[in-house]
Amino acid sequence: MKLLWQVTVHHTWNAVLLPVVYLTAQVWILCAAIAAAASAGPQNCPSVCSCSNQFSKVVCTRRGLSEVPQGIPSNTRYLNLMENNIQMIQADTFRHLHHLEVLQLGRNAIRQIEVGAFNGLASLNTLELFDNWLTVIPSGAFEYLSKLRELWLRNNPIESIPSYAFNRVPSLMRLDLGELKKLEYISEGAFEGLFNLKYLNLGMCNIKDMPNLTPLVGLEELEMSGNHFPEIRPGSFHGLSSLKKLWVMNSQVSLIERNAFDGLASLVELNLAHNNLSSLPHDLFTPLRYLVELHLHHNPWNCDCDILWLAWWLREYIPTNSTCCGRCHAPMHMRGRYLVEVDQASFQCSAPFIMDAPRDLNISEDRMAELKCRTPPMSSVKWLLPNGTVLSHASRHPRISVLNDGTLNFSRVLLIDTGVYTCMVTNVAGNSNASAYLNVSSAELNTPNFSFFTTVTVETTEISPEDITRKYKPVPTTSTGYQPAYTTSTTVLIQTTRVPKQVPVPSTDTTDKMQTSLDEVMKTTKIIIGCFVAVTLLAAAMLIVFYKLRKRHQQRSTVTAARTVEIIQVDEDIPAAASAAATAAPSGVSGEGAVVLPTIHDHINYNTYKPAHGAHWTENSLGNSLHPTVTTISEPYIIQTHTKDKVQETQI
């Protein structure tokens, strides 16, 4: 009995002790929370706001606030300041709100956000700035928002989006830039760094050209509606291999070029409603293997041969939604019919025509090459390579690609590329093929037996009459070859020229080198001729200067030229002697002005000498006796005779 009482008491104590321990633990937890709250300061809700959920949600909407109110609790996780008159966000305004996750500043009059305005918001997940007056993107204010996932900037008068505008928030997953009606410029690097972005809204931004979206490698949803895209070209969505939803509604699109959607391999939903589309290129949606939702309604579709492939594709891949893709607008007898109801029996269609067929090409190794194949824009183009590979615009090859116009492009040809290449053009009525031979020679060797002829082989395939009543299906193209129902082959010999062996392959490179060599020769010749003319002119100038200097020197030398003086004795007082002297005069002296010389008694008295310059004639310094009459002459008579070399002075 005693043992039973002890067991009962033991169980009773255990039953009482457990609730006591539990209540004690709860009291301690409550005390700790109170102490923590006391240490953090008093948690009071601003008088102009309403708070709930223990101050974690603060709502201050429609209070006419011109600035962020003071005293917002530090444990706030949700702050709504929408529909006020806040004009500026100053730095460190929210510095104490470390737990804030959602900040709503939409529908204010914010014109400026200072750098550091969002400092301290390490936990911020969503930032709403839509319907404000921002003219620039406040990139500097996004610093340190390491957990930001959503950014709303819709309906602001932003004029441009510069490069790296959002690179400070690489964690961003949703970006709303819709209704930027003042937007005029988007930089090529505007979206650099947003490799985590999943959703982008650029609707109603007055965009006329598709911006560069290549950095958005992870983008899954793209809204481009309400813009002005007359055309959608290939490469517009380059790099968006992860895109799943694309909306281009009400954007005035009138033309979508073939291969425009080739890069969108993951696309699931495509909306092209409310545009100006009348037809689509053949097999436009073939690369979109996962496309299950397509909207083409409210477009002026022209139901002719170019629309047959689309009608078949809609019946084949979207059988449950016949009203998704609109009705025929033309011709009149087809107006109002759904696209899925259009069949081939209503039309007489022909196979596509190759307007510019490829031509045989001889080329050296390691060079670029192209084989053209220009076709109607509503047809599809594929190329069959010599090894059996079929390439389209969407195919990937390290060196060979199909351009948008159907041209087969080689970034670098190799010897193994030699062979026949076939361009295969397809529309709903049939196929047309054109082949060309590519001959690749070694860069170091000349190609022997080269011929300049070009052979173009064109094969046209049309649907047989038996196939008209059957449902249209695309003709499969395999590497083993193409099997047409009706085939006509036409070989056109453009030109034939027999050329001897050992003729080098004419190439653009050789022609360029010859042209360059000729230019160098002409340039050198011009330089030589110019130098010759310059030297000739210089020599002529030097000759003229030399002649003038020599003439001036001769004129100056006449002053210092030597003089010859002849002194002749004359006796005018003896007439008899004059007649005798005339008889004895030499026969060489005659004519007007001749002087009759007196008889010379002494031959030694005839003197000829050259006096020094400035000599005086007052006396004779020779010491010889002269005729007595010489001394009776009062003044000497000077006769000067000028010659080229000297001046002779004669004293009479």
UniProtKB/Swiss-Prot annotation:
What single Pfam family name could you report for this chain, choosing any that match?
A: LRR_8
Q: What tissue specificity is annotated for this entry?
A: Mainly expressed in the brain. Expression is concentrated in the olfactory bulb, cortex, hippocampus and cerebellum in adult brain. Detected both embryonically and postnatally with stronger expression in postnatal stages.
Q: How does it assemble?
A: Interacts (via LRR repeats) with NTNG2. Interacts with DLG4. Found in a complex with NMDA receptors.
Specify the protein name.
Answer: Leucine-rich repeat-containing protein 4
As for subcellular location, the record says:
Membrane; Postsynaptic cell membrane
Q: What is known of its domains?
A: The last 4 C-terminal residues binds to the first 2 PDZ domains of DLG4.
Tell me yes or no: is Membrane among this UniProt entry's keywords. Answer: yes
Keywords for the protein's UniProt record, in alphabetical order:
Cell membrane, Disulfide bond, Glycoprotein, Immunoglobulin domain, Leucine-rich repeat, Membrane, Postsynaptic cell membrane, Repeat, Signal, Synapse, Transmembrane, Transmembrane helix
Instruction: Report how it sits in the membrane.
Output: Single-pass type I membrane protein
| Boundaries of every Ig-like C2-type domain copy | 352-441
Q: Would you say which domain of life the source belongs to?
A: Eukaryota
Q: Where is the signal peptide?
A: 1-40
According to the UniProt topology, which residue ranges lie Cytoplasmic? 548-652
Can you tell me where the transmembrane regions are?
Answer: 527-547
Chief subcellular location equals membrane
**Described function:** Synaptic adhesion protein. Regulates the formation of exitatory synapses through the recruitment of pre-and-postsynaptic proteins. Organize the lamina/pathway-specific differentiation of dendrites. Plays an important role for auditory synaptic responses. Involved in the suppression of glioma.
Report domain LRRNT positions: 41-74
Please describe the post-translational modifications of this protein.
Answer: N-glycosylated.
Residues on Extracellular side: 1-526
An example GO CC term for this entry is: dendritic spine
The chain's disulfide connectivity reads 45-51, 49-60, 303-328, 305-349, 373-423
PROSITE patterns reported for this sequence: IG_LIKE, LRR
Q: Is Signal found in the keyword set?
A: yes
Which residues are sugar-modified? 321, 362
